[in-house]
Amino acid sequence: MDKLVIKGGVPLEGTIRVSGSKNASLPILMASILLDEPVIYRNVPRLRDIHTTNKLLGILGCPAEFQGDAVHVRPCDLNPEAPYELVKTMRASVLCLGPLLARLGEARVAYPGGCAIGARPVDLHLSALEKMGAEFELDSGYIVGRCRQLQGAHIRFDFPTVGGTENLLMAATLAKGETILENAAREPEVIDLADFLCACGADITGQGTDVIRIRGVERLHGCEYRIMPDRIEAGTFMVAAGITRGNLLIEDCPDDALDAVSQKLRDMGLHVSREEGGTRVRYQGHLESTDIVTHPYPGFPTDMQAQFMALMCVADGFGMVEETIFENRFMHVLELVRMGADVRLVGRTARVRGGRQLRGAPVMASDLRASASLVLAGLAAQGETHVQRIYHLDRGYESIEEKLCPVGADIRRVPE
């Protein structure tokens, strides 16, 4: 197992490129199950979760392999069972449920695992699929689903669930009749999935709004598709520029998907602008804290909450962070406190007293975004920080040390 050793206090300057989106790649790769022809995905990040998904697709009958930055998938003899050995490591594996039911009329998917940052129940997925004619039972830790043919339905989500919207979006493409999804998630990754499905012959309208209409088609064909850039990686690099008092040009930055993040950075005193070649984020001599409340898109993303808390620790003044999406998403707080941060928790709210000089310390990552927060804190801290359990980080960031070192970071990966 590896750890990152970071010597902080160096402003980051230069150009850094954003990889393809993990959260767009996972459902789009799962959508391969719906196709009856080969497909090529470009701009796919080389991450642990992507490699796990490729292995899972192979077991399900869709052999997938990297060729350069592209993943080639060849759907062939489909298998309805997603085994526990792979599913236990990644919650997104439940996204194969809808496509399997749509193609085979059956699915046997182990109950999902992944980051321990909240319940993230799959009941929203199951109850919606039941309205389309599926039946489910839990058998020895597996979700077992069956149907003759999925039927179009009018479905309203109690909460704009991203995974639920994606699962139903995929299932409905091959269903009989029209499916309407109300209170659907509006995230850019949902739009990317819908755009991919349309490129394969699906009939979908309304993506990006809270009402999506899908008219089922007989089949979906293959295509070549480029995955959108990763808005959370881009946001993390934007915070890195601020927390190190640096100046970064971020290439392939999906600006339109980061309005809430960019505005909060401006509120804190950073220069953020679009220019030829990317998005510029520059420290302007002062950082002032702010308040953050996480919301579904287009609100402030929960996946950027931990990174902003690290930034608020070194900014002047007091700030509040309220987490409304997931419970248990403040596990990075105790590690930041070990580095000298002043953060107090009350329920789902964190009160951050800024203006602190963080100091290097051994810290332990508890989930993907918490690990990013600790890396950012290490970049700003005096002395040396050791971030342990970085397998969480590798699930969502493509060789982060190889991207940060060329812009001035002193960060290296070593065995524990």
Curated annotation (Swiss-Prot):
Binding site for UDP-N-acetyl-alpha-D-glucosamine: R91, R120, P121, V122, D123, L124, D303, I325
GO annotations of cellular component type: cytoplasm
Protein residues bound to phosphoenolpyruvate: K22, N23
CDD domains for the chain: UdpNAET
InterPro entries: Enolpyruvate_Tfrase_dom (IPR001986), Enolpyruvate_Tfrase_sf (IPR036968), MurA_subfamily (IPR050068), RNA3'P_cycl/enolpyr_Trfase_a/b (IPR013792), UDP_GlcNAc_COvinyl_MurA (IPR005750)
Localization in the cell: Cytoplasm
PANTHER family: UDP-N-ACETYLGLUCOSAMINE 1-CARBOXYVINYLTRANSFERASE
Positions of post-translational 2-(S-cysteinyl)pyruvic acid O-phosphothioketal modification: C115
Active site location: C115
Record family assignment: Belongs to the EPSP synthase family. MurA subfamily.
The protein's name: UDP-N-acetylglucosamine 1-carboxyvinyltransferase
Alphabetized SUPFAM superfamilies for the sequence: EPT/RTPC-like
Main localisation: cytoplasm
Keywords: Cell cycle, Cell division, Cell shape, Cell wall biogenesis/degradation, Cytoplasm, Peptidoglycan synthesis, Pyruvate, Transferase
EC number in record: 2.5.1.7
Enzyme class: transferase
GO biological process terms held by the UniProt record: cell division; cell wall organization; peptidoglycan biosynthetic process; regulation of cell shape; UDP-N-acetylgalactosamine biosynthetic process
Job description of the protein: Cell wall formation. Adds enolpyruvyl to UDP-N-acetylglucosamine.
A GO molecular-function descriptor: UDP-N-acetylglucosamine 1-carboxyvinyltransferase activity
